[in-house]
């Protein structure tokens, strides 16, 4: 319950597994069907993919966060994982987005929409040849990131279904793999891309994940601001080089501490076509006035980091620099320290 907005938030899910499970629902291979219902705030442009958004460490932020809507979701998910590491996930998602003071739904004619519905139908195909897991009593952990991972996702939401005012039709694909550099460590590499084929509201477009916390979050940008970039086509990359002591091992006292170097380079290059630009498509909702939106004009957003891993066997500390779109940004959005718990085996 929120004491300031005076709204209840809740979530519930029910899953049936076609395979017998010994300890937990994510045991490989998964073959299940799940129905879920959720009502909560939607932190627009800040979707943490591998961390619970209610994590206490995410509550400390470098700037005030007001870009939120209320979102109600009713989902049906079917997941099938095969022994050859090919998986299919099909989903039907009835979603209602409710406007707030900071994220209103207003078109260029001044027409205000308090809320709108979309019914998303999506299919995700994933193939990771050679992928293996270490299964504990509560979770499964991938143990060989050398395996390449290919993911293809397509999402379609027809106009008019359950009152949906717009069509959404978009495709995304990604590739990730670990590359070994012999005695010089290894590189974890990921590249992603996507395109929106339809004329759709901005919340259904392709928005990079901004990370306002002081923690290191995968597949997000540590110094980007929420809704700073909104695109209907993009390509992004994320490279982390783990040097395995290639530099620090030459310093005798430091070598005994077994500290390890970590360097990262990530970026996002996107574009927004006229059909999804609310200034040129009058019936689309305008971007929020409170959002720091900036068109890309062919120049990618980029940031780099350098850090030390294996502090106390479990801590990584990075210093991050923003390379592009620095003009007009506060100091906290140009560079800063970030930390993460990182345990290796």
Where are these regions (language model features)?
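Exposed, low-structure sequence patches enriched in small/polar residues
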Residues: 1-345
């Amino acid at each position: 319950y929120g004491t300031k907005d005076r709204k209840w938030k809740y979530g519930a899910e029910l899953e049936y597994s076609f395979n017998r499970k010994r300890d937990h629902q994510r045991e490989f291979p998964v073959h299940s069907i799940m129905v879920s219902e959720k009502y909560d705030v939607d932190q627009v442009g800040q979707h943490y993919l591998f961390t619970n958004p209610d994590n206490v460490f995410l509550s400390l932020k470098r700037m005030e966060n007001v870009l939120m809507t209320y979102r109600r979701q009713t989902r049906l998910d079917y997941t099938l994982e095969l022994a050859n590491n090919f998986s299919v996930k099909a989903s039907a998602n009835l979603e209602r987005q409710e406007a707030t003071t900071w994220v209103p739904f207003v078109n260029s004619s001044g027409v205000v929409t308090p809320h709108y519905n979309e019914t998303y139908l999506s299919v995700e195909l994933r193939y990771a040849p050679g992928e293996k897991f270490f299964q504990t009593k509560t979770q499964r952990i991938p143990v060989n990131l050398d395996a390449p991972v290919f993911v293809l996702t397509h999402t379609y939401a027809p106009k008019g279904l359950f009152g949906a005012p717009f069509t959404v039709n978009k495709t995304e694909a990604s590739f990730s793999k670990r590359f070994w550099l012999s005695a010089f460590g290894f590189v974890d590499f990921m590249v992603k891309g996507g395109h929106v084929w339809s004329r759709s509201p901005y919340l259904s477009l392709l928005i990079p994940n901004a990370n306002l916390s002081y923690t290191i979050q995968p597949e997000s940008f540590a110094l980007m601001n929420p809704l700073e970039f909104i695109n209907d086509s993009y390509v992004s990359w994320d490279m982390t080089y783990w040097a395995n002591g290639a530099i620090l091992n030459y310093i005798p006292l430091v070598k005994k501490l077994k500290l390890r170097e970590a360097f990262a380079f990530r970026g996002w290059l996107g574009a927004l076509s006229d059909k999804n630009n609310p200034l040129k498509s009058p019936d689309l909702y305008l971007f929020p006035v409170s959002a720091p939106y900036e068109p890309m004009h062919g120049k990618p957003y980029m940031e780099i980091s350098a850090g030390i891993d294996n502090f106390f066997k479990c801590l990584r500390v990075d210093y991050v620099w923003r390379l592009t779109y620095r003009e007009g940004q506060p100091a906290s959005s140009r560079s800063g320290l970030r930390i993460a718990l990182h345990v290796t085996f």
